């Protein structure tokens, strides 16, 4: 799990720093609406919708907001969103993947390209960096849900590929094909997880100096602040001192 804690810290910067709850709720609602529109409005029968609702509850999104986002999917005036993936290289040649839900792909591409150019990076073609990441499912539980041994035993029995336990909680990784079944099995034993999601996990991470790291973290913050960008993944490590300095 090289660079694991750094990967987690960088991915969670947005969750800790985003003071604009309305923007965060808007992104969560957009994912809920898209998930409900593509499948069924019943989360018991729609794994993507269920995962989106879990993410919303983890951020204390009001129940009314969640229900309204689901209902919006069946309305005649429901907005149509394109699901896109952008890939590129940031400062220091660090690989970055962005998952986007947008109602204007030209605007999204233009904005993201501008962010990369201004940061000294460049936006590439789809597939230009994703080969350096694994597409995995992750299920997360708080540390007090189970001991590390009990979680490991249950996860392996459910078909998980890897388990990382620590003070911050339990992270269970499984293949894209099996992680929904793994999540369901663990929920039957430990209750609802705090997170169930498909992610892009870097196969390896590269250490960068503080100057490059600061540029990268600023770029990631810019991307996360964009209304259309749902998730950002990158394959770098920075010093704990820099993370602390920037509030990571």
From Swiss-Prot:
Signal peptide: none annotated. The keyword Transcription applies. Residues 1-21 are annotated as: Disordered. Its main location: cytoplasm. The keyword tRNA processing does not apply. NCBIfam families: PRK00110.1, PRK12378.1, YebC/PmpR family DNA-binding transcriptional regulator. It holds the Pfam family Transcrip_reg. GO terms for cellular component: cytosol. Gene3D superfamilies: 1.10.10.200, 3.30.70.980. GO terms for molecular function: DNA binding. It comes from Nitrobacter hamburgensis (strain DSM 10229 / NCIMB 13809 / X14). Keywords: Cytoplasm, DNA-binding, Transcription, Transcription regulation. It is found in: Cytoplasm. GO terms for biological process: regulation of DNA-templated transcription. Coiled coil: none annotated. Belongs to the TACO1 family. This is Probable transcriptional regulatory protein Nham_3525.
């Amino acid at each position: 799990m090289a660079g694991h804690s750094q990967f987690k810290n960088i991915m969670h910067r947005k969750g800790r720093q985003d003071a604009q709850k309305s923007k965060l709720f808007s992104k969560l609602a957009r994912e809920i609406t898209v998930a409900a529109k593509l499948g069924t409005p019943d989360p018991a029968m729609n794994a993507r919708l269920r995962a989106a609702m879990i993410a919303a509850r983890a951020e204390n999104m009001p129940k009314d907001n969640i229900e309204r986002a689901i209902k919006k999917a069946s309305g005649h005036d429901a907005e149509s969103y394109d699901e896109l993936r952008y890939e590129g290289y940031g400062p220091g040649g660090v690989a970055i993947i962005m998952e986007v839900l947008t109602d204007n792909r030209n605007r999204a591409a233009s904005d993201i390209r501008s962010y990369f150019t201004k940061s000294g990076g460049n936006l590439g073609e789809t597939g230009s960096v994703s080969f350096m990441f694994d597409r995995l499912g992750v299920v997360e539980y708080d540390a007090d849900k189970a001991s590390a041994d009990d979680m490991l035993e249950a996860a392996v029995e459910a078909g998980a590929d890897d388990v990382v336990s620590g003070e911050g909680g339990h992270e269970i990784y499984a293949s894209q094909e099996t992680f929904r079944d793994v999540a369901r099995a663990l929920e039957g034993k430990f209750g609802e997880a705090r997170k169930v999601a498909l992610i892009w996990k870097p196969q390896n991470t590269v250490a960068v100096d503080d100057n490059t790291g600061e540029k990268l973290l600023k770029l990631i913050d810019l991307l996360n602040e964009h209304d259309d960008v749902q998730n950002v993944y990158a394959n770098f490590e920075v010093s704990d001192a820099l993370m602390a300095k920037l509030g990571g």
